[in-house]
């Protein structure tokens, strides 16, 4: 199994309906190939972790990378893992408002990622949320 973490920027700020559609499709697609993960959205920025069988994660990531709705896709980490950090989450999620408009995103994300035992992974998500709240 592997875990892949990436960040990207949406071409347009996603509406709540857009995010609901993204999550619905992600959960359906991920469950079908045994991929789990977490998506945090702050304004137009997305931070996402995907974990599961290597072929499934890489296929999912490449499909996401081809999506024209976003750009500046940067892979932050990709590592072999022996256990999942996101359990049975086909795709957990937390959405904030535009950067600087949502001080609660930090607390929400910190609570969401508290069970994650990998401090580096947890730090990516909490750091992202803190930057979104402070921007």
Residue ranges and their predicted role:
Residues 1-135:
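Charge-rich, low-complexity N-terminal segments
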